[in-house]
Amino acid sequence: MNILAIGAHPDDIELGCGGLLLKASRQDHHNIFMYNLTRGGASGDPEERTKELIRSAKFIGAKSLWIDNFQDTKLSLSSDLINHIEFFIKKSDPDIVFTHSIGDTHHDHRAIAGATIEAGRYVPNILAYEIPVTRDFKPQVYYDISDVIDGKIELINIFWSQRGKSFLKSNAIRGLAQYRALQSRFNHTITGVEAFEVQKLFFGKEFKLLKFPQEKISNSMFEEMPNEIIESKST
């Protein structure tokens, strides 16, 4: 499977789906591609941030990292932005694309989200990730990262130049993952989750979904059931 992760700034991809990418890269049949549109010059030295981004891609085990030269904080939904994203979509031939949420508060993120939807019109699956400061986010997909949450924190720590930002601290990363795990109500053994919004989701023939066995119903519950249950069966 080819996976393309798109981000506006160094550390966006890692915050949004770093755990998923770490797990995917450990499996031989997954190819990770990363496309970053700016070098983050509005929040630090762009050369230093570029070096951090390269170290991050190596840590993840990405097959390719592409770094563009759009100006930080100046992105807008335009044909130029759409064309650039479409070029790297065609270059990576992804089965799934991860990008920013259309409801994000940062205008760079919103521009990329909209451009990805247009550029990815022939991509079967597009999911939008969140970062700890994303607000209007309504997840429908949850991915278990319990076994790599420490690795994700180590990944985020690569961005040393941004260490002063509270949402990059380990308690913010772990706290969001724990909150999404509780929200998903999967299973008490799952302690860390990355959540995603669905922009496009195409199921193939296998239609494999994660399932946990339901808890057994106690006998006392049956005392509260009605005396007669009529079950309708189609003929």
Give the positions of each predicted feature.
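Active-site rim/loop-helix segments in enzyme catalytic domains that contact anionic ligands
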Residues: 1-93, 121-122, 209-216, 222-233
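Divalent metal-coordination and catalytic microenvironments
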Residues: 11, 38, 53, 65, ...
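Alpha-helical elements of Rossmann-like donor-binding domains used by nucleotide-donor carbohydrate transfer enzymes
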Residues: 19-20, 52-55, 80-84, 111, ...
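Structural signal for conserved beta-strand scaffold positions within catalytic alpha/beta enzyme cores
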Residues: 36, 66-69, 128, 142-144, ...
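Flexible loop residues that form catalytic
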Residues: 40, 70, 102, 131, ...
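Active-site adenylate/phosphate-handling loop in enzymes that bind or generate adenylated species
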Residues: 88-133
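The feature marks non-catalytic terminal segments
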Residues: 134-235
